[in-house]
């Protein structure tokens, strides 16, 4: 009886939080719509794309492997049922509507900095020469502060005009962010069911600079690659008519004494994720109301951990926290980093769940959403260290964290990302990282830290009131904090510009297995835009519809927060299309088929109202990942025998 009451309490609270989120987001979207729809004010020449498929493209699309999840009751897909192509759509007549710029004034929370005239995001074009190479100069350039650029009022007028009219613009491609993805199409290997490791002959043991691997060719006019723009015609049926089995978060199950996996599984949550002691009582991030995935995998015989890192911080800070979560010790964000961005150098102290984690004792990382970016940056620091921290220590002396020294390869066996915005998301570009949303979110996080209600992991920004500090002094110190317009935040790292900086900094490790899982929960309309599927988690509908209407057609299919093209792989890194039976590949992104009907929350079961995906379907999805990781261990043990 007590357990049932606990279950209902958690579900009601979850629904209430979701409803509140929708109302707040909707109000912000209506009031600050001019700010939320950031587009270039200058007219750009767009390259028309052929929407119709050629017969060759059609054949290629149908040969793409399909995701297969091991379910208790297998469902068969009728391959004979092809999607009926829509007739050519006549272009809607263009209507000119004059809209005055929004006259709304942004109200700043009481604890916010007095005036924010310069937003943290910038409308700055990254030179192609910079994108084409990751030289030492470009690395140093990204270390420096970049001055914000003011957006003109004409931007707002154009954005509001776009919202008020039904004008259909020709499909276009953003040359800054999409041309590399067009030129870097997936390779489709033959799937023969073998598990032998296939290492690219071009891959060498020593890591080579990324500028030797990037195609520097200029973008050229191409037909839209069907596999990258819209959901494929054939998908494994992921929906289920069964209602989800609601389960309360039980007591933690201990790891097995003799686990099946030699290398532990480490799950890393994304933005606004709460795990462990910082989670609300009864909250279960990995599995939601459907299953406790950690306990489920431990009962199945796997050594499994759920990392707990900051919910709002930047990938740098989250990567550092992930390191100390595993190794133990007091978090050191770095002397150079903390001085540059204006926050405290040291954070919380972790006990350490894998204190013996070192070269030769690797782990498997599985990251959802922003967690995938965090993992990639941590792996980079393990191998190469942080050049800025090394230079600072050489100049000023003092202590430097072992993480920033580098030289720690062979600590990661595999990296698996789920719905990760490797190339950023328009949801952060045009909504999340706008001044209004930043101020509301950080003010709430600051108040929660002050009251001790919710730990957003931002105490290094001084959100916690000091002993003996008056309330007046505390409010003044918070108002003068650099957090309000800083780029050292999760919201900035999730923008396309912030993600591009991470992509330029990191590179593939030839000794690691990489894999990505992607969902799409939108469908194309007669006007060529994408709207949310029926049943999408309702807090994602607003952003899902917004992303589905952006100018760049390649970015429209999405899972409610992340575009399909962003989740598949970093834009400038090697990739290959695979399915569950494909042979294993090191040093390249193994891209699984897009999972139709899966939104951003479905992958972690965090939609209490979802009836499309059952608990068994969710657990089977993670069992398929576990099977893949065990195949890797078997292949590695055979190779080393």
UniProtKB/Swiss-Prot annotation:
Its cofactor is Ca(2+). Residues 1-38 form the signal peptide. Residues 95-106, 127-139, 227-239 have a biased composition (Polar residues). Ca(2+) binds at residues 535, 599, 602, 607, 610. Residues 73-94, 140-165 have a biased composition (Basic and acidic residues). The active site is at residues 369, 559, 600. It holds the Pfam family Lip_C. Residues 53-64 have a biased composition (Low complexity). It catalyses: a triacylglycerol + H2O = a diacylglycerol + a fatty acid + H(+); a 1,2-diacyl-sn-glycero-3-phosphocholine + H2O = a 2-acyl-sn-glycero-3-phosphocholine + a fatty acid + H(+). Has a broad substrate specificity hydrolyzing a variety of triglycerides and phosphatidylcholines. This is Lipase. The lineage of its organism: Bacteria, Bacillati, Bacillota, Bacilli, Bacillales. The gene is lip.
């Amino acid at each position: 009886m007590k357990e049932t009451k606990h279950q209902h309490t958690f579900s009601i609270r979850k629904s209430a939080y979701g409803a509140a989120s929708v109302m707040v987001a909707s109000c912000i979207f209506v009031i600050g719509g001019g700010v939320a729809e950031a587009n270039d004010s200058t007219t750009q020449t767009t390259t028309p794309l052929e929407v119709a498929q050629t017969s060759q493209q059609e054949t290629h699309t149908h040969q793409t492997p399909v995701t297969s999840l091991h379910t208790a009751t297998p469902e068969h897909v009728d391959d004979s049922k092809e999607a009926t192509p829509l007739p050519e759509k006549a272009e809607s007549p263009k209507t000119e509507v004059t809209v005055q710029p929004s006259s709304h004034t942004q109200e700043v929370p009481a604890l916010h900095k007095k005036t924010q005239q310069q937003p943290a995001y910038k409308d700055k074009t990254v030179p192609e020469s910079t994108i084409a190479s990751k030289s030492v100069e470009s690395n140093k350039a990204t270390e420096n502060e970049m001055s914000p650029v003011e957006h003109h009022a004409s931007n707002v007028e154009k954005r509001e005009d776009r919202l008020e009219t039904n004008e259909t613009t020709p499909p276009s491609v953003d040359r800054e962010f999409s041309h590399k993805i067009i030129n870097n199409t997936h390779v489709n290997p033959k799937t023969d069911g073998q598990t032998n490791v296939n290492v690219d002959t071009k891959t060498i043991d020593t890591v080579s600079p990324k500028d030797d691997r990037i195609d520097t060719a200029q973008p050229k006019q191409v037909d839209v690659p069907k596999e990258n723009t819209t959901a494929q015609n054939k998908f494994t049926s992921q929906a289920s008519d069964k209602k989800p089995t609601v389960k309360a978060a039980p007591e933690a199950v201990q790891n097995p004494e003799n686990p099946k996996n030699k290398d532990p599984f480490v799950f890393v949550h994304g933005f606004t994720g709460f795990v462990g002691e910082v989670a609300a009582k009864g909250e279960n991030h990995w599995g939601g109301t459907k299953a406790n995935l950690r306990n489920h995998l431990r009962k199945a015989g796997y050594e499994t951990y759920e990392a707990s890192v900051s919910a709002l911080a930047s990938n740098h800070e989250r990567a550092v926290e992930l390191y100390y979560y595993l190794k133990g010790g007091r978090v050191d964000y770095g002397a150079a980093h903390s001085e540059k961005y204006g926050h405290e150098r040291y954070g919380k102290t972790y006990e350490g769940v894998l204190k013996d984690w070192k070269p030769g004792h690797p782990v498997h990382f599985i990251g959802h959403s922003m967690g995938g970016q965090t993992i990639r940056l941590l792996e980079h620091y393990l191998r190469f260290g942080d050049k800025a921290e090394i230079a600072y220590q050489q100049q000023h002396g003092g202590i430097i964290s072992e993480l920033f020294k580098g030289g720690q390869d062979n600590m990661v066996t595999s990296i698996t990302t789920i719905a990760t915005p490797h190339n950023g998301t328009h949801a952060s570009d045009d909504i999340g990282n706008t001044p209004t949303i930043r101020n509301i979110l950080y003010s709430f996080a600051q108040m929660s830290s002050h009251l001790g209600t919710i730990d957003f992991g931002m105490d290094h920004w001084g959100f916690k009131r000091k002993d003996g500090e008056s309330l007046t002094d505390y409010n003044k110190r918070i108002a003068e904090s650099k957090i309000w317009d800083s780029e050292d935040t999760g919201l900035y790292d999730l923008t396309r510009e912030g993600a591009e900086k991470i992509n330029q900094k990191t590179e593939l490790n030839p000794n690691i297995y990489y894999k990505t899982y992607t969902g799409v929960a939108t469908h194309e309309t007669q006007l060529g835009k994408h709207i949310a599927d029926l049943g999408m988690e309702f807090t994602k509908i607003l952003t899902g519809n917004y992303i589905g209407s952006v100018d760049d057609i390649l970015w429209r299919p999405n899972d409610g927060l992340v575009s399909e093209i962003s989740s598949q792989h970093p834009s400038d890194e090697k990739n290959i299309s695979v399915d569950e039976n494909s042979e294993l590949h090191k040093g390249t992104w193994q891209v699984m088929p897009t999972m139709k009907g899966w939104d951003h929350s479905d992958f972690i079961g965090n939609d209490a109202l979802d009836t499309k995906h059952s608990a068994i379907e969710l657990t089977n999805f993670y069992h398929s990942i576990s099977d893949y990781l065990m195949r890797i261990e078997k292949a590695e043990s055979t190779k080393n025998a």
